[in-house]
Swiss-Prot record:
<keyword id="KW-0067">ATP-binding</keyword>
<keyword id="KW-0648">Protein biosynthesis</keyword>
<dbReference type="GO" id="GO:0005524">
    <property type="term" value="F:ATP binding"/>
</dbReference>
<dbReference type="GO" id="GO:0070681">
    <property type="term" value="P:glutaminyl-tRNAGln biosynthesis via transamidation"/>
</dbReference>
<keyword id="KW-0547">Nucleotide-binding</keyword>
<dbReference type="Pfam" id="PF02934">
    <property type="entry name" value="GatB_N"/>
</dbReference>
<comment type="similarity">
    <text>Belongs to the GatB/GatE family. GatB subfamily.</text>
</comment>
<dbReference type="InterPro" id="IPR023168">
    <property type="entry name" value="GatB_Yqey_C_2"/>
</dbReference>
<dbReference type="GO" id="GO:0050566">
    <property type="term" value="F:asparaginyl-tRNA synthase (glutamine-hydrolyzing) activity"/>
</dbReference>
<dbReference type="GO" id="GO:0006412">
    <property type="term" value="P:translation"/>
</dbReference>
<comment type="function">
    <text>Allows the formation of correctly charged Asn-tRNA(Asn) or Gln-tRNA(Gln) through the transamidation of misacylated Asp-tRNA(Asn) or Glu-tRNA(Gln) in organisms which lack either or both of asparaginyl-tRNA or glutaminyl-tRNA synthetases. The reaction takes place in the presence of glutamine and ATP through an activated phospho-Asp-tRNA(Asn) or phospho-Glu-tRNA(Gln).</text>
</comment>
<comment type="subunit">
    <text>Heterotrimer of A, B and C subunits.</text>
</comment>
<protein>
    <recommendedName>
        <fullName>Aspartyl/glutamyl-tRNA(Asn/Gln) amidotransferase subunit B</fullName>
        <ecNumber>6.3.5.-</ecNumber>
    </recommendedName>
</protein>
<dbReference type="InterPro" id="IPR018027">
    <property type="entry name" value="Asn/Gln_amidotransferase"/>
</dbReference>
<dbReference type="Pfam" id="PF02637">
    <property type="entry name" value="GatB_Yqey"/>
</dbReference>
<dbReference type="GO" id="GO:0050567">
    <property type="term" value="F:glutaminyl-tRNA synthase (glutamine-hydrolyzing) activity"/>
</dbReference>
<dbReference type="InterPro" id="IPR042114">
    <property type="entry name" value="GatB_C_1"/>
</dbReference>
Amino acid sequence: MNWEIVIGLETHTQLSTDAKIFSGSSTRFGAAPNTQANVIDLALPGSLPVMNRGAAERAIRFGLAVGGKVAPRSVFARKNYFYPDLPKGYQISQYELPVVLGGSLSFFVGEQEKTVNLTRAHLEEDAGKSLHDDFALASGAPASGIDLNRAGTPLLEIVTEPEMRSAAEAVAYARALHSLVVWLGICDGNMQEGSFRCDANVSVRPVGQKEFGTRTEIKNVNSFRFLERAILFEARRQIELIEDGGTVVQETRLYDADRDETRSMRSKEDAHDYRYFPDPDLPPLVISPEWVEEVRANMPELPAALRERFQRDYGLSAYDAAQLSASRGLASYFEDVARALPAGQAKQAANWIMGEVTATLNREEKDIADAPVQAPALAALIGRIIDGTISNKIARDVFSAMWAGEHGGQPDAIIEARGLKQISDTGAIGAMIDEVLAANPAIVAEYRAGKQKAFNSLVGQIMKAAKGKANPQQVNELLKQKLEG
C-alpha cells in the first residue's frame, strides 16, 4: 500500500520586544536564573497583567505580511494546565478570537513553488524553563530547578493548515517562515536560544483517502535538520505500526536527536481539556484601522514584492529571485553588485552570489553581513570576467584570494600580482592551437570522424598549454575554424 504523509506546523516565534508581554521584566537571554521575573511573572497574589503594545504591533506586522486578517478585536484566554514552570497554573493565550486569521506563505521546495495556507496566528506568553541537566542540591543530591526568566516572554504562535505532504516541504516552509519573521524584525530567529521552535503534527493515510489519520504532535523542535529527521521517523513509525495491525494513538511526542527517534511524552490533549475561558484580568485587544495603516506605512519591502521586482527589473527566474530574497542582507548585497555592473549582467551577479559566495558562507557558517568580500569588490571581479581580463575559472581562484584578504581583497591587484590576465591575442592562441593539433593527429582524425569528445580533449590540451589563461571563447572559435577550414 502507498502512503501519504500529512503535516501541519505550529511555530512558536519569540517576539523581539525588550519587555515581556504582560510585565515590564526584561526578555534578555542568558541572565542568571530567576533574575528577570517580577511579581507578575511569578503570579504573586494581587499582581495584574498589562498588555505590551509592542507585541501587538509585531503581530499586526506579521498579519499584513502574510495577507491575513488582522482582527479589530481579539480576546485573551486562560489555557489551564499544570506544569512546574507555569506559576499561575494557566497560560495566557488566545483561543476563539486570535489576533490574525488566515493568510498564506509561498516558498520553494527545490525549484517547485508551493503555497501553504495559515489557519491563524495568536499571541501568548511563554512558560518558564525546567532545568534537569547538571543541576543538583547543595548536598549533591540530584534535583530539578525552575528558571522563570522566560516566563511571560511574548510569543506569536503561527499555525498552518495540514497541507504539507513531505518532510522536505515542511522544512522549506519553516525556513521561509523563519526568514520572514527575521526580515520583518519581529523575531531574532535564534533557534539555539529557543526564539523559533516548531511543533509538527504528523499523520499518515493511504494515497487517495480523504479522511485524515490519527495525528501525533512532535514538540519543540529547534533545528531544521532535526525537524526533517523527526517527521521522517514519525511517519515511518506510524506506517509500520499500522501495517503490523496496530493503531496510532493521539499523543504528544519528543524527538531524541541522539537516538534519531520520537518517543511518547504524554497523551495529546484536546481543546476542552484545557478549559479555555476569557481572561478576566485583561480587556480585549482592540486594533483600530488607523493603527493597522500606521504599521503598514512602516513595513519594509516584503519578500514577495521583492521577488517580483527582481524578476521584472533584473530578468531573474522565479527560483533565483526567491533564493536572493531569502534575507534582507542577501537581497541588498545582490542589488549592490547588480547595480555596479553593466546593464543586462545581473544574472552574472546572481550566479556568483548563489554559487561561490553562498557556498563559502555556508562552509564557514557565516552570515552575508560577515562576508569579507564586499559587494563593490565582487562587482569589480565580475567586471573582469565580462571585459575578458580573466576567465570564470581563474575568477574563482581570484575570489578565494579576495576572501582570504590577499592584496586588500582587491581583484585587480590580485590579478596583476599573480599574472592572471587572460590571453586574448588571436595570434598567440592560434600558435598554441597549431602546436596542439600537430602533436595530436589521432585526436584530430577522431574529431573529423564525428567524435565531439575529441574536440573537448583538444580544448583541454590547449588550455593546459596556456596554463589556463587563454580566452576560452576564442580558443573554441579558433580551434573550430582550424579543424573545419
